[in-house]
């Protein structure tokens, strides 16, 4: 690391798998920015101390992954509207003695759907599968795209209803119908289905019936790699267009880079390079 390079990192547990250092290194090259970005494995009970240490080292910003997104929102000095709505943060900006929290997950998802996949969300019917932290982090930005309807389903119906209730005011403002449906029998089909669960990791079946799909629906899994494959295979077998969350990963990173550096890096070439690297076993 050169003396002029600003320090950034991603904090999580586990963290060894993170592609973020590679992504941000490419962003820095493409935008001629001088920075150093590293992984930091944080003890489960040591997140607050890790933030203090990072700030003391002169750190300028960090990405936050599981399981610290809720704690990141709580420990920040200021919070964006997205963080206030989601209750979780994936991006921190250090400025003097203050820490500003933001959440770029939903922005990344929206960018990958509308630009990467070329599927508009305005006026469309969207099914959000899951009501945990991943779903909460993206519902606000999805609503801001003015879809006709967003339905939320979850194994625990009360959690789906709670997520709907927490976003009801924004939905009314956007004139979008927002409701919770029965996961096993939603009774409707959708243009876009977003899987925000870890069903594949848990070895379970796809959590919704094929009746939710329309011909040509976009079925999007927020995960990527082997974790997303069962959902993607299911979607393809039923005639949907399947897309994993690798583009979301790159796009949310680009939004974080914009917050830190004031310039949004080109995401398409970085995503293309990343897919090629993963396909080659890197």
Curated annotation (Swiss-Prot):
One of its GO terms (biological process) is shikimate metabolic process. The keyword NADP applies. GO terms for cellular component: cytosol. Keywords: Amino-acid biosynthesis, Aromatic amino acid biosynthesis, NADP, Oxidoreductase. InterPro entries: Aminoacid_DH-like_N_sf, NAD(P)-bd_dom_sf, SDH_C, Shikimate_DH, Shikimate_DH-bd_N, Shikimate_DH_fam, Shikm_DH/Glu-tRNA_Rdtase. The active site is at residue 69. It is an enzyme of class 1 (oxidoreductase). Its EC number is 1.1.1.25. Pfam families: SDH_C, Shikimate_DH, Shikimate_dh_N. The keyword Chloroplast does not apply. NADP(+) binds at residues 81, 130-134, 154-159, 222, 245. Shikimate binds at residues 18-20, 65, 90, 105, 224. Pathway: Metabolic intermediate biosynthesis; chorismate biosynthesis; chorismate from D-erythrose 4-phosphate and phosphoenolpyruvate: step 4/7. Belongs to the shikimate dehydrogenase family. Involved in the biosynthesis of the chorismate, which leads to the biosynthesis of aromatic amino acids. Catalyzes the reversible NADPH linked reduction of 3-dehydroshikimate (DHSA) to yield shikimate (SA). HAMAP family: Shikimate_DH_AroE. Homodimer. This is Shikimate dehydrogenase (NADP(+)). It comes from Acidovorax ebreus (strain TPSY). The lineage of its organism: Bacteria, Pseudomonadati, Pseudomonadota, Betaproteobacteria, Burkholderiales. The gene is aroE.
